[in-house]
């Protein structure tokens, strides 16, 4: 028979969420490490390098799905995401975006270090000899307009969600996802049409690392927005509780800003 003291001990007396033990952080770390190993093997043309990279990336996406499933269950169905918990989550997302900014800062540092003082090995000029750079006013400029437009549509969705305009929220978020897919398609087409590759010296390595890493962030942001669209259609995002979408929107605006720096620095200035 349950006594009153036992019930009192089982009642949570604080607004914080004590997360249950989860395997996903450890498994995600293993998948990310495997992706790095597979990427290095693929770049150096090792046997099965592309296979390891593909399998590791698929496993990473699967872990993202299962981890988000647990977080959504804890927030939407179990009610663990109180106001204080959401404040902590917002702070965590801000720190995550800051760490991503530092990541891209390293790529820009490598690019400007090589372009502002080109060495004799590449002809003491920038772009290096033998590199046919891409025209910044073709696909890159079109992709810039697409990403800027997607930033407008995701802001439209946020304002519609706060104003409880459900139909506009669904429409604007759907348009954002479509624009993201179009951007990724054009980026892949641009890669296929480029005359230089990742192994073509410092220009190719800095170009593909910076733009490719940004493309990976676009893919992650697209998946995040797609999850938000599914949750919005299932009435899991409301006028008062929509932190999942809010964090995805922050992330998407970060992707927009990074692309503007990439376009101005690498495509426009770096290719002139």
Swiss-Prot record:
Alphabetized UniProt keyword annotations: Membrane, Mitochondrion, Mitochondrion inner membrane, Translocase, Transmembrane, Transmembrane helix
Report the top EC class in one word. translocase
Q: What functional role does this protein have?
A: Component of the cytochrome c oxidase, the last enzyme in the mitochondrial electron transport chain which drives oxidative phosphorylation. The respiratory chain contains 3 multisubunit complexes succinate dehydrogenase (complex II, CII), ubiquinol-cytochrome c oxidoreductase (cytochrome b-c1 complex, complex III, CIII) and cytochrome c oxidase (complex IV, CIV), that cooperate to transfer electrons derived from NADH and succinate to molecular oxygen, creating an electrochemical gradient over the inner membrane that drives transmembrane transport and the ATP synthase.
EC assignment: the record states: 7.1.1.9
**MF terms in GO:** cytochrome-c oxidase activity
Gene Ontology terms, cellular component aspect? mitochondrial inner membrane
Q: Which family does it belong to?
A: Belongs to the cytochrome c oxidase subunit 3 family.
Protein name, per record: Cytochrome c oxidase subunit 3
Reaction catalysed by this enzyme: 4 Fe(II)-[cytochrome c] + O2 + 8 H(+)(in) = 4 Fe(III)-[cytochrome c] + 2 H2O + 4 H(+)(out)
Q: Membrane topology for this entry? A: Multi-pass membrane protein
The answer to keyword Cell division applying to this record is: no
One protein family per Pfam: COX3
Q: Which GO terms describe its biological process?
A: mitochondrial electron transport, cytochrome c to oxygen
Q: Which gene encodes it?
A: COX3
The compartments listed are: Mitochondrion inner membrane
Whether 4Fe-4S counts among this entry's keywords is no
What quaternary structure, including any partners, is listed in this protein's UniProt entry? Component of the cytochrome c oxidase (complex IV, CIV), a multisubunit enzyme composed of a catalytic core of 3 subunits and several supernumerary subunits. The complex exists as a monomer or a dimer and forms supercomplexes (SCs) in the inner mitochondrial membrane with ubiquinol-cytochrome c oxidoreductase (cytochrome b-c1 complex, complex III, CIII).
Q: Where do the TM regions start and end?
A: 23-43, 45-65, 91-111, 137-157, 169-189, 210-230, 249-269
């Amino acid at each position: 028979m349950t006594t009153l003291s036992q019930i009192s001990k089982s009642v949570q007396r604080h607004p914080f969420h004590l997360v249950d033990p989860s395997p996903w952080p450890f498994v995600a770390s293993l998948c990310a490490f495997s992706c790095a190993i597979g990427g290095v093997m693929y770049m150096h043309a090792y046997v099965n390098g592309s296979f390891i990279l593909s399998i590791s990336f698929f496993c990473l996406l699967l872990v993202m799905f299962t981890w988000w499933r647990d977080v959504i269950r804890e927030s939407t169905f179990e009610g663990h995401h109180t106001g204080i918990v959401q404040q902590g989550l917002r702070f965590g997302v801000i720190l995550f975006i800051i760490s991503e900014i530092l990541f891209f800062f390293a790529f820009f540092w490598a690019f400007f270090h090589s372009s502002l003082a080109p060495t004799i090995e590449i002809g003491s000029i920038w772009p290096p000899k033998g590199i046919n750079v891409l025209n910044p006013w073709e696909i890159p400029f079109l992709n810039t307009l697409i990403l800027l437009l997607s930033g407008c549509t995701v802001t439209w969705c946020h304002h519609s969600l706060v104003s409880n305009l459900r139909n506009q929220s669904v429409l604007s978020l759907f348009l954002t996802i479509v624009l993201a897919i179009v951007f990724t398609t054009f980026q892949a087409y641009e890669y296929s049409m480029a005359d230089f590759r990742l192994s073509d010296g410092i220009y190719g390595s800095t170009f593909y690392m910076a733009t490719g890493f940004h493309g990976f962030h676009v893919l992650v942001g697209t998946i995040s927005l797609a999850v938000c669209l599914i949750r919005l259609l299932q009435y899991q995002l409301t006028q008062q509780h929509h932190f999942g979408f809010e964090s995805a929107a922050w992330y998407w605006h970060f992707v927009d800003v990074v692309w503007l720096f990439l376009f101005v620095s690498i495509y426009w200035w770096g290719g002139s």
